[in-house]
């Protein structure tokens, strides 16, 4: 099959790669859509050697083959794929039995991701989508799950005033997650006009310019002078700017949920969140939702 690889020089190249072969509990999925995550771009920029396996973890496709112990009726199903969690989890360690497959201590070896014509994952990590869901939408299921998990890690409560830092894919899906989980007001910071418009279309109440020096003052005005009950950080990167903003924009005894991937060690003033008695939660990928 054809697959795309980061070549270690900041470029992606297409070349031949062996077709995946299913194990007993696996499914082979013909890839129909793969999203490009910000983490893919950050890792590509950091690489100095070519990848041996294709990346890509926001994937939707059609099951075309299954292993010996998988129900054959799954063939032909349209699915979104949990590439990192159940798709590779052992299902027997303490974390798997607790429903936290992303934290599996016996994770199967990487098999390659969705920047390829086909991908192999455990069948239990494939979630059926209906015929009215487009392939592009199927690739958004994974980042939406990331945002739902992050909002839950931040203990979002009904009526909360929520600030979302960043309006990329994770920030935009965090708008949907926060609204569906009962947020009373959702304020998002966006760098580009088209991001702000999309955030408002998805349900954000207010979109602010992330580069404005007045953003902090505006957030205070919009939150009755207190600050956000919960701030969801979705940017990450190589400097602590959005971490500093998260502390600034969040009220005393408020909560911060960090979804963004920070790629280098950072210097950060921990005294400020300590004095404000803020709770800081880190969130990686996704877990079960209400036991499902």
Predicted regions and their residues:
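Hydrophobic beta-strand signal
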Residues: 28, 60, 80-81, 97, ...
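Adenosine-phosphate binding glycine-rich loop
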Residues: 258, 277-292
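Mid-domain Rossmann-like dinucleotide-binding core that forms the NAD(H)/NADP(H) cofactor-binding site
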Residues: 133-213, 217
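NAD(P)H dinucleotide-binding glycine-rich loop of Rossmann-like/cofactor-binding domains
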Residues: 85-165
